[in-house]
Amino acid sequence: LVQGMLKDGVSSWVPTLITEKYDVSASFSLLLSAIMPIINLSGAWIGTKLYEKVFRLNEAATSAFGFAMTLIPLTGIVFVGKYPIAICVILLALFTTIIAAMNHLLMTLIPVHFAKFGRASTVGGIFNCCTYIGSAISTYGFGAVSEKFGWTATVVFWIILGVIGVA
């Protein structure tokens, strides 16, 4: 759930965050946001290398490390609007790349372990279901939080979700 909330929820709200905090046009913020998926492709590669080489196929350690790493750019994003837009985009791209790595781990690498039991698809389906429940909650929820409390509170909420992901 947390991974889906962070992956899809943050990505969905990035253009609005940039538009509102930097007073740029929606089309410009969408253009900046369009760069991120290209950069995020490296997340799957990085996630696989961490999982196989650094954490030696330990899913829990890889996941905890990845979620801990999301806290670095998220902490910087708390101060969005107080530094140049380029830094914001770099921090957001770093965050979305890390969360893409976690998505690859949870959706692809972990379910493969269940193939020997004939359950890879079942596990993958359960993980996908949880991801999209999180996505649905965050798409509405992050907007509600930002409307009521502002973007700083929303990013602090993202940090709390990152901490939950570490646990």
Label the model's feature ranges:
Residues 1-48, 103, 107-108, 138-139:
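Extracytoplasmic gate region of multi-pass secondary transporters
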Residues 2, 35, 39, 69, ...:
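Small/hydrophobic positions within alpha-helical transmembrane segments
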Residues 17-22, 53-54, 109-117, 148:
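Helix-to-coil boundary motifs at intracellular loop junctions of multi-pass secondary transporters
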Residues 25-33, 88, 120, 124:
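Juxtamembrane helix-start elements in MFS-like secondary transporters
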Residues 44-57, 146:
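Helix-to-loop junctions at the C-terminal end of transmembrane segments
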Residues 57-109:
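C-terminal transmembrane helical hairpin of 12-TM major facilitator-type secondary transporters
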Residues 58, 141-162:
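A membrane-interface helix-boundary motif in multi-pass transporters
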Residues 114-149:
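A late C-terminal transmembrane helix in Major Facilitator Superfamily
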